[in-house]
Every structure is written in structure tokens, then in C-alpha cells.
């Protein structure tokens, strides 16, 4: 899905390359990382809790575009005085079913942890609506930027390139930027996500293993998603097609990443899309969904009377997906930790601005299957949304 590295660690913190300023270094001693870790652990953000311990000073003084970076004096002055920082967060939209709820919960819990390290407040500049709009996201960021209301920024991009310009613009003003959820190619200090093509391969391996253990001989596959054109969706589809084609002799795909079924992110439209696809493609035996819609594929399968004959796999957590796993129609829900992605930004900002360290990209998919059981995932989801 992208060509850039996931963990950047490529920034000079000040002229020394080791500390942001002497004033900040002196103030940094009071940061309560242990307290932050406890809060992250309380919320089951275990990868982030580990990431705090893995944070380290950058290995290079160069950003992705070859420039160097120095934190703005206005920010270091705030830190030296113990003033509250403005942490800005921009994700796809505030009304995307299931996704937005988990991102909002995550950023809120992330701020809770980050405050143990540095005083800060949340400024959520994400646009309204139920689909991701790049221009609206950028406009929201610029509105805060132009009024001096950003001291650190985290972005959940649509793809690997659409936010490169705004990232460079914000960084040029001495404001740290982090990205989450999608591989990206800007000047951001670090990124917290997975590699989409590898995710697709992992999904294929899970399905192949499930087929072997359950004596399933499925041959006809299809791929789908809310926005198949997105680079992360393309990677997940491409990896899945490659993995299944290699591991299942005689496998046939009714479509690929080039023409994946577009379901939208609207629940009713997604269900209708799957019902129509299944009715129009009676030979299909397995449908990959690359985001949150697999529960609707499972529902469409059940409504068509094809339970036990057609199966699905999807990403992220929802009660509907967990129910579909328990029912045996969905093979797995690949949890990419939306809430942890949202929580990464404030914690990464606090660690960087307090100690001059960059948190590693240690995120990994956590598959939920019938074998692993759904009970823990249900508790986690309930905790996130509480």
C-alpha cells in the first residue's frame, strides 16, 4: 500500500539532536510514564503500554523529505511553564458507524494517559458525516493551525499520500505530527498501523488454516469493502487474493482488488450490497470484507439460507461480527485496534515533547476466532465504548 517506512524516528529535536531545549529537558523530569502505562493497561491498550517503554530518541536528524525539524518556541515555552498543550486529532469523520465511536473513545482515553506525562487538552477537528472526506479533514486542521490552536497533531489519513502536504506544512511550523491507522509517506515523526498487504496475507493464512481444520473445500472467493479504492483496502484485498491463490489449489476469484465489491460504510446499504451480490453470484463460497462490514455479509448469508455453505472474514470489532463468529459464518475478525490507534497520538505527543523520544510502531493485528473465543473481545469492546 505504500513505500515509506512505518516507524520513522527521523527527526532532530533541537540543535543538539538529543534534547528539544534545555528548559524542556529540565521540565521533563516530572513526567509520570508509569502512571500513563497503568492507565493504558486499564483500558487494555497493551500495545501502546508496551510502546511507551520502547520509545527512544530518533536515530537520524533527517525527515522523510530531507529537512530537519525543531519544535516551535511557543510550544517549548508552554512546556517550560507547565501550561496545557493543544493536542489536535483528525480522523475520517465523526459519523462512520462503529469506527467513529471507537476512535472517539480511544482519543479520549489516550488524553487521559497522556496527561500523566504532560498537561494537554483534546481538540478533535474531525469532520461531520459518515464517510471520509480528505478536503474536509484538511480544512479542519488548517482552521486550528491558522488560529494557533495546535501544539501537536495526529492524523488518521485516507491513504498514503493525501495528507503529505498538510503534514509537511504543520511540521514546517515546528509542530510535531504523527499518523495512525494507515501507512503514510509524509514527514510525520512516527506511524502506528500495520502493512495492509501483509494483513491480507495474514487473513488468507487464517482462512486456509480454518479450512484445513474444519475440512472445508472452498474454491470460489470474492473481495469487498466500504471503499475498495482506498490504498489500505487495495493492499488487504491484493494480499488475500495472493495468499488464497497460492495456498488453495484451484481457487477462483470472482473479483480482485481491481474490481472489489463496494459496499459503502452505511449499514443498510452494506447489507443490501451483500444480498444483491450473493443473489447474483450463486457460486460464491467465501467473501472477504476489508473493514467493518463482514457482519452484514454474514447476515446476508443467513438471510439467503446459505449458513454453513458461504463464509466471510473481516476487520475490526463489532458485536455483529462477534455474533457471526460464534454462529460459525465468520471465520475471524482481525482487530487492528481502532481505539489504540486513536490513543497513540496524544501519548506519542506527550512522550516526544516531554522526553524527546519517538514511540515505535509496534501495532499488530489481533485475530478473534471461534477457537480463541469472543468473550474477551466482547469485554474489550464494551470497555472501549463505555
Where are these regions (language model features)?
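Bacterial N-terminal signal peptides that target proteins for export
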Residues: 2-12
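C-terminal segment of classical bacterial N-terminal signal peptides
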Residues: 19-27
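Extracytoplasmic "Venus flytrap"
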Residues: 33-40, 45-46, 61-80, 84-110, ...
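An alpha-beta-alpha
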Residues: 87-89, 93-97, 101, 107-112, ...
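Hinge/cleft segment of the Venus flytrap/periplasmic-binding protein
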Residues: 29-85, 244, 337-386
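Hydrophobic alpha-helical segments within soluble ligand-binding/sensing domains
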Residues: 67, 71-74, 137, 191-220, ...
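Flexible loop/hinge segments that line or gate small-molecule binding clefts
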Residues: 160-198, 318-331
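Hydrophobic alpha-helical
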Residues: 139-172, 240, 258-324
